[in-house]
Swiss-Prot record:
Residues 305-324, 332-361, 405-439 are annotated as: Disordered. The lineage of its organism: Eukaryota, Metazoa, Chordata, Craniata, Vertebrata. Belongs to the ATG13 family. Metazoan subfamily. Autophagy factor required for autophagosome formation and mitophagy. Target of the TOR kinase signaling pathway that regulates autophagy through the control of the phosphorylation status of ATG13 and ULK1, and the regulation of the ATG13-ULK1-RB1CC1 complex. Through its regulation of ULK1 activity, plays a role in the regulation of the kinase activity of mTORC1 and cell proliferation. The modification Phosphoserine is found at residues 355-356, 361. This is Autophagy-related protein 13. Changing residue 447 to A: Decreases interaction with MAP1LC3A. It is found in: Cytoplasm, Cytosol; Preautophagosomal structure. Residues 127-134 are annotated as: Important for interaction with ATG101. It comes from the Eukaryota. It comes from Homo sapiens. Changing residue 134 to D: Decreases interaction with ATG101.
Length: 517
């Protein structure tokens, strides 16, 4: 489709759409894990905070999404779909919902890519966070365990709604207009759960009260063993290292001016899940979020829930491979300001050496490994970055001189000058003239006493006296009654005399009225 976008805007838009598609898959899959997700807010956004949301990516899901995209982007005629299905321990399966990210031909030529499209995609992603938790599949995912698990599948192409059965419902999450088309995010979900109602998914208690394997329980005791979520085929070597988080977002390290850089990444260590074979299915589940692969469906991720007894593995990288230790770069005191990362790490990642004598303890090594990256639309001074390595959205508006937070007047405002009140000065002058010893005034603290609605002539008044005095204020002069004024009876008595005077001078009054006309 021919558009009037320049090369930079087109590059920006493609990047926004790509990362929006990846974040969409993350939000949908994480909403079907069966666990509540609690994310703490942060005042210092990192490079992974795309669209102003702190969504922690699961590496396996990102890898699966990128493999499904295969370098493509959702466009007119090409839709990205995420299918959520349910599979029981007996082998029965049922599709629950299908999320579709597509684009139509309706264009908005006047919209700005840099700000407007980015902010609207952020709102659409927030709407998706809410909608994924109101469909029936969310309630089923919270109850998954030994009896059934929730699967997901990502595919690119025509939407397949035949598996949802009759009478399925559709909901449109939202739309965002772009210069190349309108992005639409919608969901079709099953409402007929007759397959579920005919079964009693009740967890039978064990015969003995002893748990032999307290780490993992197989969700499919009668089916084939589950493969770990490491995306290896049968012919691949068991020592294949899974790509790290920063490698999964390599597009962030390009010369893109309006997107945040890569995630809060490790410039030395890469995430390496344990390489487990088919025969070790019992230990295959605690991988990032306790997931496994179905042998018959290698692209479907098994997500056992909390009732299945599957623990969640700590979300930390695995240390200890010799290849990673060989890539550790050393920094001399002369060039300890910035140390370039090794080729295996992200291109724009820089570390700061914290060792003053060239020797680094294990704690210092960990400090030099992780670097905080500037996130989307963040213009906060950071010690670890320079103008040459700064890669933030709209970098042209960034300040030319990056100041440290210690000298930043917005972070540490200067102390206000101390002002001495006249009352305090007079008290100090009286004390100094009274004697040279000063022992009399050492036991007192001089304060500047300024009572509310007070004047200088009533400064000795305390708060109680002030309150009592103004509790009964004097009456207003406009409401005061003149004692010498005539009463109503006297006014009525003098009325005939006033009328007689008026009748006598009626001509003068008439002439005066005529002059007024």
């Amino acid at each position: 489709m021919e558009t009037d976008l320049n090369s930079q805007d087109r590059k920006d838009l493609d990047k926004f759409i790509k990362f929006f598609a990846l974040k969409t898959v993350q939000v949908i899959v994480q909403a079907r894990l069966g666990e509540k997700i609690c994310t703490r807010s942060s005042s210092s956004p990192t490079g992974s905070d795309w669209f102003n949301l702190a969504i922690k990516d699961i590496p396996e899901v990102t890898h699966e999404a990128k493999k499904a995209l295969a370098g493509q982007l959702p466009a007119v005629g090409r839709s990205m779909c995420v299918e959520i299905s349910l599979k029981t321990s007996e082998g029965d399966s049922m599709e629950l919902e299908i999320w579709c990210l597509e684009m139509n031909e309706k264009c908005d030529k006047e919209i700005k890519v840099s700000y407007t499209v980015y902010n609207r995609l952020s709102l659409l992603l927030k709407s998706l966070l809410a909608i994924t938790r109101v469909t029936p599949a969310y309630r089923l995912s919270r109850k998954q365990g030994h009896e059934y698990v929730i699967l997901y599948r990502i595919y690119f192409g025509e939407v397949q709604l035949s598996g949802l059965g009759e009478g399925f419902q559709t909901v449109r999450v939202g739309t965002v207009g772009t210069p190349v088309g309108t992005i639409t995010l919608s969901c079709a979900y099953r409402i007929n759960l007759a397959f579920m109602s005919t079964r009693q998914f009740e967890r039978t208690p064990p015969i003995m009260g002893i748990i032999i394997d307290h780490f993992v329980d197989r969700p499919y005791p009668s089916s084939s063993p589950m493969h770990p979520c490491n995306y290896r085929t049968a012919g691949e070597d068991t020592g294949v290292i899974y790509p790290s988080v920063e490698d999964s977002q390599e597009v962030c390290t390009t010369s893109f001016s309006t997107s945040p850089p890569s995630q809060l990444s490790s410039s030395r260590l890469s995430y390496q899940p344990a390489a487990l074979g088919v025969g070790s299915a019992d230990l295959a589940y605690p991988v990032v979020f306790a997931a496994g692969l179905n042998a018959t469906h290698p692209h479907q991720l098994m997500v056992p829930g909390k009732e299945g007894g599957v623990p969640l593995a700590p979300n930390q990288p695995v240390h200890g491979t010799q290849a990673d230790q060989e890539r550790l770069a050393t920094c001399t005191p002369s060039d300890r300001t910035h140390c370039a990362a090794t080729p295996s790490s992200s291109e724009d990642t820089e570390t700061v050496s914290n060792s003053s004598e060239g020797r680094a303890s294990p704690h210092d090594v960990l400090e030099t490994i992780f670097v905080r990256k500037v996130g989307a639309f963040v213009n906060k001074p950071i010690n670890q970055v320079t103008l040459t390595s700064l890669d933030i959205p709209f970098a042209m508006f960034a300040p030319k001189n990056l100041e440290l937070e210690d000298t930043d007047p917005m972070v540490n405002p200067p102390d206000s000058p101390e002002t001495e009140s006249p009352l305090q000065g007079s008290l100090h002058s009286d004390g100094s003239s009274g004697g040279s010893s000063g022992n009399t005034h050492d036991d007192f603290v001089m304060i500047d006493f300024k009572p509310a609605f007070s004047k200088d002539d009533i400064l000795p008044m305390d708060l109680g006296t002030f309150y009592r005095e103004f509790q009964n204020p004097p009456q207003l002069s406009s409401l005061s009654i003149d004692i010498g004024a005539q009463s109503m009876a006297e006014d009525l008595d003098s009325l005939p005399e006033k009328l007689a005077v008026h009748e006598k001078n009626v001509r003068e009054f008439d002439a005066f009225v005529e002059t007024l006309q």
